[in-house]
Amino acid sequence: MAGVMARFFYGANKIVATALFLVLPAALPIAAQKSPSQSASHKTSTKDASGDSSKPKLVVILVVDQMRGDYIDKFQRQWTGGLKRLVDEGAWFHEAAYPYGATETCVGHSTISTGAFPASHGMIGNEWWDREQQKDVTCTADASVKNMAYEDGRAPAASGAVVGASSSTSKAAGDSAARMLIPAFAEELKFQSGAGTRVVAMSLKARAAITLAGHQADSVTWWDGGTGLWQTSSAYPQAPFIAEFVKLHPVTEDYGKTWASLLPESAYLYDKAAVNVGSPAGYGSTFPHPLRGATDGKGPDVSFYLQWATSPYAETYLTHMAEEAVEKLQLGSGAGIDFLSISFSSVDYVGHAFGPRSWEIQDELARLDRDLDEFFTHLDKTVGRGKYVVAFSSDHGVAPVPEDLHKTGVDAGRLNLEEVRSRIEQTLEPLHYAKPSVARIDGADVYFTRGTYTKLKSDPLALQAVIDAMQGTPGVARVYHAEELDDRPATRNPIRAAEAAGYFKTRSGDLLIVPKPYWIWDYSAPGKPARNGGTSHGTPHYYDQRVPVILMGTGIRRGKYYELATPADIAPTLATICGITLATQDGRTLHEALDGSQSTQGPSSTQAPSSAQARSRSEAHTPADR
């Protein structure tokens, strides 16, 4: 779901905060495009980390895809399990936010895993236009590897694909972390913390599991929504425990079940029926949601797989798979510091379909609260309470469904990118430019055909005419050209700074569109109804940028913190706790949340915000958390 949305007037609020985030990173050089294996920090240590009681035995990164930061404030009173434990026992950075505009899944997961921004790690979106190959590429696409499906007990005819623990899928290119240009925290942990460290990652999405694990891992597992099969690729070892688990527990066991509301009606904050254009995941607009696909009782199909992914059943399945990994691999019981990451994707699918102001999103989180309670209890019993550290965050937030806001009089809508393309072509045609002049528009990124942008740069009047035409499109707030963003320019404009932090010269567009707040991308033909309903993300607006950052466990001082923080701070902080060094980082170590065994800096408990920070937040929340 290549989503994106609105931007520009999120208030004087995060203007100061975003600029502060980018002051130091702006001085750092963009990582050279070299193999992460060349990192100077990749020196394997022979020291056994198991004897140091100040270090965790297991590092766990939990990512809830598309979890807005304000969901905790809105829904936590209904939580009694794992989410409640994170808030109560963890170090919660209340105002954490991404300081860049490319708030998408691949970008956020890469930032969490590396401690760097897109301008350093190179993952600028879920996909981008490859100028050399003249085609779209996904962020984890790798033609040198093959994806391998795990058999799950179904006959091949039922699954729609050749299955087996060592069989290749039909996809032309496989998936790996080859396009991520710097090492992940998990890789550095494996190289530096001592022999025996195991790295395990899992998610419904390949781009989530792979980027959290990095280039070298012991088990990386994701799900193919087209076949309903779990898979890995030849870039990683196949995991016998995964093969056994999915064979014993096929996803199709959930066929015919119904997702009904968990909470009493009085507990839900919003209207029962979500405002939506279209049919969300093949469901109706209100509970209950039966998981019966398009065949309605004739067996699992692709529609069922979409429904399953857009339901709490998928999160529960991943939780059980993670518990199996801990049990079978004895994670947290070896000679090194082990690593486990789980990215829960269903909140993202539910959010895209129903929006953040829906019963479904509230219910999904209430059920995840139960799953995480079970998971933490399992870790307490197998690894030991106090012997593991958890980092909890999200890859991005999300905008409200624009129609939901529009009916209240807010300027919100769907920015038609085909109209943007048409305006560019109409502007350049009489100036004798090649037709077509536009090769691809992917959300904010506009890519021109070969030679067109070079010609435009030498013709400033034509370039300005194109930008003016684009800015006349309903929903467009601003257009930047590449030269305004390259090399992270020093700027007091927080929007330009945010776009620059997400810009990577050889991958980003020639022009970048900044939508107005509460406007999201629409790829339908001009004048036609919106192709997709629901909502999306992918802009430098606060509702896209603000996400949870919570640390809990070994080395962490619990409390509620109001200091500036970003998910890029997670990897540096975990590195400090584990006693390793990252190759490249744009984030900082959150010293204020570390206990005395890890840091001599920082406060002892909850930190009240300064008056400037409090003023900044109040301004930001005025419309941005609608």
PLM segments and residue spans:
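Secreted, luminal/periplasmic, and some membrane-associated catalytic domains
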Residues: Q78, E95, E104, N126-G174, ...
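Long, low-complexity, polar/charged, intrinsically disordered or flexibly structured peripheral segments
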Residues: P156-K171, T211, T252-E327, L331-G332
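Active-site His/acidic residue clusters
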Residues: I210-S219, L291-L306, T310, Q330-L368, ...
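Active-site regions of oxyanion-processing enzymes, predominantly non-cytosolic
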Residues: F191-Q192, G196-S203, A209-L212, E315-Y349, ...
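Non-catalytic, well-ordered alpha-helical segments in soluble enzyme domains
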Residues: G69, K84-R85, I182-F191, G443-Y480, ...
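Short Gly/Ser/Thr- and charged-rich N-terminal loops/segments
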Residues: Q601, T606-R615
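Active-site-proximal N-terminal segment of extracellular/periplasmic enzymes that hydrolyze or transfer
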Residues: K34-W92
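Short, structured active-site-proximal loop/turn typified by the sulfatase FGly-forming signature C/S-X-P-X-R
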Residues: D73-S120, R198-M202
